[in-house]
UniProtKB/Swiss-Prot annotation:
SUPFAM superfamilies: AtpF-like (SSF159468). It is found in: Cell membrane. One of its GO terms (cellular component) is plasma membrane. NCBIfam families: PRK02228.1. It comes from Methanosarcina acetivorans (strain ATCC 35395 / DSM 2834 / JCM 12185 / C2A). Keywords: ATP synthesis, Cell membrane, Hydrogen ion transport, Ion transport, Membrane, Transport. GO terms for molecular function: ATP binding; proton-transporting ATP synthase activity, rotational mechanism; proton-transporting ATPase activity, rotational mechanism. Has multiple subunits with at least A(3), B(3), C, D, E, F, H, I and proteolipid K(x). This is A-type ATP synthase subunit F.
Amino acid sequence: MELAVIGKSEFVTGFRLAGIRKVYEIVDVPSSESAVKSVLEDKSIGILVMHNDDISNLPEILRRNLNESVQPTVVALGGTGEGSMSLRDKIKQAVGVDLWK
């Protein structure tokens, strides 16, 4: 399984430097939509990394597909918008229990 990264230039640069080969650089919402669809169809990709703000800009149906996706597993990083979650919330969603209580 491979790792794929979708995002703007400043987001994906570090992943490129780390040796990630499947990097999809986006500039607008239509390019992010096509990149996400391409990754969802590629069965060799096991993990998809995206910036939370880029996920928030996607159409609702595509966001739902990403949230429900098992393969690839979607990892959303960063973001300050309404859709961003704290680490605590992400763990609670993944595990189903609030471990900090």
